[in-house]
């Protein structure tokens, strides 16, 4: 028997797996319909599946809404610190910041600057959920406030693209004060008679929704986006009631007057251009031609 086992061992050939040259992200599975989509085709559609599911974009990917070559970044040097010396059971906040910055290539959540859409100049601030859940900390608030003040100074509209899980707990009350700081900057924008257009994308929760994103002149949401302050489970546990199936979706918010329109990503560029043309024709910005033809809001 021993000899038989030894002979059988010699008869087997060890086959090592062949390493594939195909990168892991060539094919992307839709979280909704589970279809596999070639990454180049997905990029051409701005990460919208054929089933209509809107996947998350990075802040840099959102900048494709702007005219090519028009974006000039501001405040890229701003980086968050660790004012509380926060340490959780899993890791220190300072370590988490360094790792997230390395992984995303961002200094913090917000990328901001000045660009144009079909020739209409605007100040823009875009959130990236990949950076600690899009949480609102000191640099987030500072960049957003500066973007609003820049728009007021230059006499151009402000466009914010918002996705967030709420205030950054690692920065404590410093994070919470950003809500008031950004809203104060927006009052100066309003005094300069410049519009704030907010785009809410999935997910948009906490302090961002509770502050500046909900007081914009025009609020646009993407289809299916989850928007709210507290999460669904927290609310249900608090009020001890079952919420509607579509609660906190963009469509629910539109039905109840919390957003002005729900716009698919493929149509967003055109809608923004029409809105900018509308404000320009009203003479609210010296940066625009007074001869522009204004569309009606109903036609957008």
From Swiss-Prot:
It is found in: Cytoplasm. One of its GO terms (molecular function) is acetyl-CoA carboxylase activity. Its EC number is 2.1.3.15. It catalyses: N(6)-carboxybiotinyl-L-lysyl-[protein] + acetyl-CoA = N(6)-biotinyl-L-lysyl-[protein] + malonyl-CoA. Its cofactor is Zn(2+). Keywords: ATP-binding, Cytoplasm, Fatty acid biosynthesis, Fatty acid metabolism, Lipid biosynthesis, Lipid metabolism, Metal-binding, Nucleotide-binding, Transferase, Zinc, Zinc-finger. Zn(2+) binds at residues 30, 33, 49, 51. The keyword Metal-binding applies. GO terms for biological process: fatty acid biosynthetic process; malonyl-CoA biosynthetic process. InterPro entries: AcCoA_carboxyl_beta (IPR034733), Acetyl_CoA_COase_Trfase_b_su (IPR000438), ClpP/crotonase-like_dom_sf (IPR029045), COA_CT_N (IPR011762), Znf-ACC (IPR041010). It is an enzyme of class 2 (transferase). The keyword ATP-binding applies. Component of the acetyl coenzyme A carboxylase (ACC) complex. Biotin carboxylase (BC) catalyzes the carboxylation of biotin on its carrier protein (BCCP) and then the CO(2) group is transferred by the transcarboxylase to acetyl-CoA to form malonyl-CoA. Belongs to the AccD/PCCB family. Acetyl-CoA carboxylase is a heterohexamer composed of biotin carboxyl carrier protein (AccB), biotin carboxylase (AccC) and two subunits each of ACCase subunit alpha (AccA) and ACCase subunit beta (AccD). This is Acetyl-coenzyme A carboxylase carboxyl transferase subunit beta 2. It comes from Roseiflexus castenholzii (strain DSM 13941 / HLO8). The lineage of its organism: Bacteria, Bacillati, Chloroflexota, Chloroflexia, Chloroflexales. The gene is accD2.
